[in-house]
Amino acid sequence: MTELTNLTVAQIRDGHRAGDFSAVEVAEAFNANVAAAKALNAFIVETPDLAIEAAKAADADRAAGTLKPLSGVPIGMKDLFCTNGVQTTAASHMLEGFVPRYESTVSQKLWDAGAGMLGKLNLDQFAMGSSNETSYFGNVISPWRRNDGGNAALAPGGSSGGSSAAIAARLCPAATGTDTGGSIRQPAAFTGISGIKPTYGRCSRWGIVAFASSLDQAGPMARTVRDCAIMLENMAGFDPKDATSLDLPVPNWEAALSSDLRGKTVGIPREYRLEGIDPDIDAMWDAGIAMLKDAEAAVVEISLPHTKYALPAYYIIAPAEASSNLARYDGVRYGLRDLPQGAGLQDMYAATRAEGFGAEVKRRIMIGTYVLSAGFYDAYYTQAQKVRTLIARDFEAAFGSCDVILAPTAPSAAFGLGEKMADPLAMYLNDVFAVPASLAGLPAMSVPAALNREGLPLGLQIIGKPFDEQGVLNAGLAIEERAGFTARAEKWW
């Protein structure tokens, strides 16, 4: 029998249902992998007891004939989702020791569906970063290594780097992520797994620590497209507690999965053909186009003329919203409090925020405060919002002639830890292909498609029309079946 930790979500669900193994056996196997993988630093909090508790309930449900959609499936929870009675930190010193007395909507939906929690996964602090190097609890280290014989530590991507590393290393079969400007898709591409950011509003933001409210969107990460569909079905749905939640029924994405793209048209954006891009990325993209043609899709070139303005607009809008959202961390009600001897209220605010926030978070708060200030609001923030509208219109026009768009997920494979930390702009450029879909609120998915010449995974991105997660998943499945990506990191941890 295949080792239990090598099974996908679908295989665990179906195998447990058929009585091939117990949920407790599965939970114990993953708990053991988590305990043995401290070197990856993927988890901030481990919750083996909760995983076993849910597994026992799943086994009881099987005996009683009352199985749920995710009975027997243990998962990882990004530590941005509030979990009742379990520390939730957003990987920041500011929230170290914060234990919520309530459950986020998305995590509650997953527990209601029968899933169990293996632990809270590491991330970039307040989800701000592309390498998982901004976490107060230390870097997550990718399970992947270059094939050059060296052992340089690589970034797992960010901000959902704990999620991507844990799935790639078989510490969990699936995990939650959040995506503000690529934080599900880019780490998925870096570690050879799949991840989907659904249409903005598909998954409730209630109980997720906020970064940029008009962009933040929860989504699943897993090893296969089918697993992402299964997870997303159990995460999505209308929530009256979230003002931006979509009041739409949740489709049965898994049942409708099909890699036959007959009658579908795939758009290839000419503006994404960047000068000087890594030739391995270009080759993978061309191979992806051939795969979709093989799936009977028509392929057309499209134009997204305002693409070059997406990154600058994003790095105005997201920090502006972050500076507003993070104003709540003042040391008064919860989280860290730094009260110097004889200090007044203003001193406490300053000391608490100086101590609690990391350098990248402070950088974004300062950028955000600057672009929202009276003298610069119109010059920066208002203009960025206009650009955002133009980008959304570009996509709308492009979707007049195609059903989905194919592009690379990231401009490179995983880079070494520390390689880009000295230059924030080089780090921000990593989001160049991911940010446009976020600004337009579109569903977008990364699927592993190839290894580069260094033996590292590369991901292809599929962007869909609003609410058409099915189209995105189907194109992803077509790539998955044809790419035949089965590579996994050699165990060194």
Swiss-Prot record:
<comment type="subunit">
    <text>Heterotrimer of A, B and C subunits.</text>
</comment>
<keyword id="KW-0067">ATP-binding</keyword>
<dbReference type="GO" id="GO:0050567">
    <property type="term" value="F:glutaminyl-tRNA synthase (glutamine-hydrolyzing) activity"/>
</dbReference>
<dbReference type="GO" id="GO:0005524">
    <property type="term" value="F:ATP binding"/>
</dbReference>
<feature type="active site" description="Acyl-ester intermediate">
    <location>
        <position position="183"/>
    </location>
</feature>
<dbReference type="InterPro" id="IPR036928">
    <property type="entry name" value="AS_sf"/>
</dbReference>
<dbReference type="GO" id="GO:0006412">
    <property type="term" value="P:translation"/>
</dbReference>
<dbReference type="InterPro" id="IPR020556">
    <property type="entry name" value="Amidase_CS"/>
</dbReference>
<dbReference type="InterPro" id="IPR000120">
    <property type="entry name" value="Amidase"/>
</dbReference>
<feature type="active site" description="Charge relay system">
    <location>
        <position position="78"/>
    </location>
</feature>
<keyword id="KW-0436">Ligase</keyword>
<dbReference type="InterPro" id="IPR023631">
    <property type="entry name" value="Amidase_dom"/>
</dbReference>
<dbReference type="GO" id="GO:0030956">
    <property type="term" value="C:glutamyl-tRNA(Gln) amidotransferase complex"/>
</dbReference>
<protein>
    <recommendedName>
        <fullName>Glutamyl-tRNA(Gln) amidotransferase subunit A</fullName>
        <ecNumber>6.3.5.7</ecNumber>
    </recommendedName>
</protein>
<comment type="function">
    <text>Allows the formation of correctly charged Gln-tRNA(Gln) through the transamidation of misacylated Glu-tRNA(Gln) in organisms which lack glutaminyl-tRNA synthetase. The reaction takes place in the presence of glutamine and ATP through an activated gamma-phospho-Glu-tRNA(Gln).</text>
</comment>
<dbReference type="InterPro" id="IPR004412">
    <property type="entry name" value="GatA"/>
</dbReference>
<dbReference type="Pfam" id="PF01425">
    <property type="entry name" value="Amidase"/>
</dbReference>
<feature type="active site" description="Charge relay system">
    <location>
        <position position="159"/>
    </location>
</feature>
<keyword id="KW-0648">Protein biosynthesis</keyword>
<comment type="similarity">
    <text>Belongs to the amidase family. GatA subfamily.</text>
</comment>
<keyword id="KW-0547">Nucleotide-binding</keyword>
